[in-house]
Amino acid sequence: MLRLMRQQKKETYYLWIALFLLLLYVSPLFILKEDAHIRVHDNLDSNIAWYKVLADSGEIVGKVDAAIPQIINGLPRDAFGTEWSGIVWLHAFFSSMTAYAISQTVTRVVAFFGMYVLLKKHIIPEPKAAFIRIGVSLAFALTPFWPSGMLSTLGYPLALWAFLNIRKGDISWREWLTLGLLPLYSSFVLGFFFFLAGMACFWLYDAITKRRWNLMFLGSIAFMTSIYLFVEYRLVYSMLFEHAPMHRIEFISSRHDVWHSLRLSIKNFVYGHNHVMTVHTVVILPILMVVFAALLFKRNRTKPENVYLFLCVLNYGLSLWYAFWFNKIWAVPKQKFAFLAEFNFARFHFLRPLVIYVSFALALYLIWRMGKGWKWLVYAAVAAQLMVLAPFNEEYTYGVHYNAPTFREFYASEQFKEIKEYIGRPQDSYRVASIGLHPSIAQYNGFYTLDTYNNLYPLSYKYEFRKIIEKELEKNSRLKQYFDEWGSRCYLFVDELGKRYDFKKNSKKTINNLQLNTDVFKKMGGRYIFSSVPIMNAEQNHLALVKTFDHKDSAWRIYLYETR
């Protein structure tokens, strides 16, 4: 009993240290506030501006057929997701940076405790293995996840804990509350659809091998799914009722041959994916491979060892599925069935962070059980993984490694306030577009834009907007394919700039041969163009440079052009 109490005390001590390190990790967001560096891709260039536009529009709880006039002359309200998502209300009640900091903290804390209770209850319950449970949980919580995903992947361990409890018949209000609340801070289509599909397969496996239905387990899966369908009622409505075709129906993603797909599967297996970064290559992967090789031909394997081998196979299987979703074999089915083109089923690989870190914990536990002479390796592996993850803190990654703008410098609110005041007209009375800049910057500052980055907008608008940039696309096959076969970035693409939208004020870049159809631009309501680089042949495009704007708190020099 005394030994058990000492173990519990040590575990509590480890927990407090881990929580301190976790809060230290997110502290720059609260200390630096708008002077913090955070992710640009699929974050500053999109989601953060979306939340602000939605909050400012007054359409958070708008009708299913409502539109947001600030973007592309009426972006469907459904493009911004559901009002039942907690992150929407964080951005409605707090400033953007404060909401972001809170969201990061909530997500990482829930991820930590979710993985911890999963490992303690179902994977590594042995009291003496507390260091493994807590160390791996902390590492999982520090992974550089996609910010607007919230708990879409980092919530998997907590959900799995609840489902495994229900599967065993160990049921309380906690499990049902967990399954009921997670849909309010995660995405169905960007995460939990794939997890719930996995749970359904797990239930089916039980039903076949154990010959029992386990209706409570099945009911819990149905319960969480029904909550998601309620939360995502806008998505359900759009699927059930006719509406104008959206640009996603023209997605073309299946281009790879078999060898390309195999190479991509290995790349994904070894390095992971940008939206679900696991940072497992240097420390975790070698350990997983060595333990896998040691167990593969072992006789009389234990249950934890068999579970470990299954997870390793599943790990590569998910990478293989991801890679082959872009293979040519899917080209015809995607053409015949629109939902296969519109919905990215490759995202089953979003399960990999859960699989990798549970596998890591199991591998360390199997090593730890080999005796005292091996425990040093366990401590070293956890410490090494935490050290590998430390530089992936956003402040270091984007501030030092990428030298990206701070939040304040990116959105440049004071500079764009000067532009708004200089124009001197109500912002809803004219439309703007940007060159060499993300449209989210203008959107964040209240301007009505003809360009945008959204994952859902009318196909007819894409066709109309394309007329503006048609000649530029013809000059650049990569940009043409990028816009025509994907098109979520509905930008004023310029051949000479390529896919760069971040020319800072110290850039020497110029545009010498711009060819825009400004007649179509004006017909759509366009009046001004914000460019981060000078356009040397502006007059040939019926554009006149009105003024250049600089500001000490901005990363950009804005050349304001007006149509003539």
Swiss-Prot record:
Major subcellular site: membrane
Signal peptide: none
Protein localization: Cell membrane
Keywords, ordered alphabetically: Cell membrane, Membrane, Transmembrane, Transmembrane helix
Membrane topology category: Multi-pass membrane protein
TM annotation in the entry: 12-32, 97-119, 139-161, 188-208, 213-233, 277-297, 306-326, 348-368
Cited InterPro entries: DUF6044
GO terms for cellular component: plasma membrane
Protein name in the entry: Uncharacterized membrane protein YkoS
Organism: Bacillus subtilis (strain 168)
